[in-house]
């Protein structure tokens, strides 16, 4: 079984000399306690909270158009995260084929770990097959999501052609 953590070789005299000077953490990783957990994380959390509260107070933007219970919109769109699947249902003429295509998405996601399992590298740039599949899936998802906001006749070309 492969090791998850890289432990330092404390018998190395060069590393021991660096550690005496307060250096050498990059050799085996900087310790999370107390550096990250006590100092960096609270600063990031407080900064994020301050940013969200500041934006909410300074610019209370409307989320969308006010609701009118007496007027039905021309096209009802789902939430933004459902745009790609909505676009598949909208574009594919056969609804059973649309359901099968949407069912293939989780199946494809389950197959991702097995695509390049023989490659032992963790760096994504040294795993070309997995990186290509990931980038292709991301681009198709973005293309379908953006196309769902267009009318049906322009949704596949995104209004470019």
Curated annotation (Swiss-Prot):
It comes from the Bacteria. GO terms for molecular function: electron transporter, transferring electrons within cytochrome b6/f complex of photosystem II activity; electron transporter, transferring electrons within the cyclic electron transport pathway of photosynthesis activity; oxidoreductase activity. It is a multi-pass membrane protein. The chain crosses the membrane at residues 37-57, 96-116, 130-150. It holds the Pfam family Cytochrom_B_C. Keywords: Electron transport, Membrane, Photosynthesis, Thylakoid, Transmembrane, Transmembrane helix, Transport. GO terms for biological process: photosynthetic electron transport chain. Its main location: membrane. It is found in: Cellular thylakoid membrane. Component of the cytochrome b6-f complex, which mediates electron transfer between photosystem II (PSII) and photosystem I (PSI), cyclic electron flow around PSI, and state transitions. Belongs to the cytochrome b family. PetD subfamily. The 4 large subunits of the cytochrome b6-f complex are cytochrome b6, subunit IV (17 kDa polypeptide, PetD), cytochrome f and the Rieske protein, while the 4 small subunits are PetG, PetL, PetM and PetN. The complex functions as a dimer. This is Cytochrome b6-f complex subunit 4.
